[in-house]
């Protein structure tokens, strides 16, 4: 069975891992980095992903960041003169990760386990699956990020029984999960979170502070300047990271804008104390889901054995202190917070292929599911933190006499009124026979699969007529749209491959021209004119093809030049070897002569 890669598709950074033997290994990207910025930019028709895209974010307005925050919505982003769905942009990131994983493995990759925040709703999970499909990946499993982290942490501890709390604060989302580990079973007891809290929010607090201070000093609002804003974002992210290691950092942004008197610069010192003050409310928000998860799991703090920190934002000192204060425990630092989720996803891939044995993952649904009933009430069928996969049925009836149809309004959330919860979908069960209200028996069944994706069935028990809906993401992508996006992604991948081949060819041509010119210079006046003339002619032909920008001709002429230059190099090598041999022979003769010179004639006197 082919390898199943594990992908952590993050808000700010992503990572890909693969199982090698029994160990999960992070695959470094082409720049040698173990995580890849979740950034996509467009330039001259080319799609750029990762570090290169992030580097040009300041100067390139067609750069898209933090697309994960829009997953599961109908919101689109504009770039490159087109509109893109969040799934398409996410697919570009996935395609890039898939591409360098294939380079590393030396084989085609078609299957993946992709992680999502535990608190992602059904629409967001479906959108993630669609993104994988567009990228040419069969998504074998959607796994919650804290669960994946627990899998990576606990794989070598299957003989130990312990309860762990995973505190996962990423770039854009926050989750807390409590798991029980024992005998290879990873049982999620409860999960809670906040999909609108992450490292980006901490950056924004610094940005707002810089904008306010600059406006106070210069009377200019930098938030209205898109390029200045991107520079502020980069500076804020750097300052946040610096303050994890030092207590004060200098922010210096020369020529940030221009005033009436000329260019203006932003110079500011940010202390850790000020940063803690700015982000106090964000840190406080992390405490609520911790308490919620403990309450839902029915556990006290003393029953938690380990606290695992996941996500780059858990490096913020105030966050670490809050975790210590809230749990009364020193966090376990045995896992890399940036890499552990992708590693856990790869382990789940190994469970699916059978390479990892005796491991069972029991995850839960993060939010309650139900339907709207009379009076706009939200009636729950499946409570949050129910182990998945699961199925639940309940019988309802009509609200009016002779009602011919019922509307099934499917919702996800915790609020008592339907209007306050998230709509997952609507469908209708028709042709209900005329009867007084309360008589027809309508059975509604909810099914949640192992990926947390929901399907709902309504059945008239009198007529046996039924209607089923698989909840689609809010983006409303049809199968046809996904197929079109897949074809576009394949075409882009082919175009990228051709573009890379073209760049490689041009580099090879430049290298060959430089090397041949050097060799011709070195062989001047050393004989073998025939070989030199042939190499010079081939060099001139290649230069002409380069000038004409004819790629096919360049390829052919490059092969010809390499052949002629090699023949010349062989001659040069032979001459050098002969000269070396002659020199060695001469040296030997000289040594022999010197030995003769050292002989002293002795005098012999006979007595």
Curated annotation (Swiss-Prot):
Region annotation (Disordered) ranges: 581-607
MF (Gene Ontology): ATP binding; ATP-dependent protein folding chaperone; unfolded protein binding
Pfam families membership: HSP70
Low complexity: compositionally biased ranges: 581-594
Residues spanning the signal sequence: none
Induction: By stress conditions e.g. heat shock.
PROSITE patterns for this protein: HSP70_1, HSP70_2, HSP70_3
Modified residues (Phosphothreonine): 173
Keywords per UniProt: ATP-binding, Chaperone, Nucleotide-binding, Phosphoprotein, Stress response
InterPro entries: ATPase_NBD, Chaperone_DnaK, Heat_shock_70_CS, HSP70_C_sf, HSP70_peptide-bd_sf, Hsp_70_fam
Keyword Nucleotide-binding in record: yes
Compositional bias ranges of the Acidic residues kind: 595-607
Superkingdom of this protein's organism: Bacteria
PANTHER family: HEAT SHOCK PROTEIN 70KDA
UniProt record similarity statement: Belongs to the heat shock protein 70 family.
Function comment: Acts as a chaperone.
Protein name listed in UniProt: Chaperone protein DnaK
Organism: Streptococcus suis (strain 05ZYH33)
Gene field: dnaK
